[in-house]
Amino acid sequence: ALEDANKAEIIFNGNPVKNDTIGNFVDISIFKVKLPDIVKGTNILLVTYPFGESANLESMYILGEFGVKVMGRDASITALPEKLYFGDIVNQGLPFFGGNITYKIPVTVKNNHLTVCASFYRGALITASLDKKEPVKIIYPPYKAEIEAENGEHILELKLYTNRFNSFGSVHLVDKMEHWQGPDSWRSEGNRWSYEYIFKRTGILKTPEISC
């Protein structure tokens, strides 16, 4: 996915790639272009743009169902994690992930009522739903959802709405306490710049408390 796809010359593993677009990614200015399959080992993606004083280069994104392993400044594609645990998804193979995550939890209801408390998470909000019914928002203290349900076996789904920082943010800016984000956040230099990735924690970081 890249901006100005129609101006780009794309070569993947030595083979020219048509820059025909197949939709957008997140923003109407970012276009998706289909690449050939990635092969095991080293892959080389070469993108050539016309560039001058008035030109700007923006980030590009490799999209697909895979995981990513980051070691310092190096990142490599891995298999998609089979399951996620409560905790930071950055350390579970999804460091750049900026979509939503649904945690599915089997529960047994005994008193026609279920309470779930998810008090420690990093994201915009959580919704809780039982058997895909109407979701209940978890966003303000005490971070609880109350759900009426028939006794028996159910699937509780906790959907975390993450943010786009680890996908689009200034992931090389050392100053993690910088709360204001603007153009200069992506132009850090000197001791404010890091070749290693500086991610923000993302996920439901503590096992939710469930009573039913």
What are these regions (language model features)?
Residues 1-14, 45, 107-132, 137-138, ...:
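Aromatic-lined ligand-binding clefts that engage carbohydrates, nucleic acids, or primary amines
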Residues 2-4, 22-28, 33-106, 118-120, ...:
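An acidic-aromatic loop/edge-strand motif
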Residues 15, 67, 133-134, 209:
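Residue-level signal for well-ordered, solvent-exposed loop/turn and beta-edge residues enriched
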Residues 21-25, 134-139:
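Short beta-strand segments within Ig-like beta-sandwich modules, predominantly Fibronectin type-III
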Residues 142-146:
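Short, surface-exposed beta-strand/beta-hairpin micro-motifs centered on an aromatic residue
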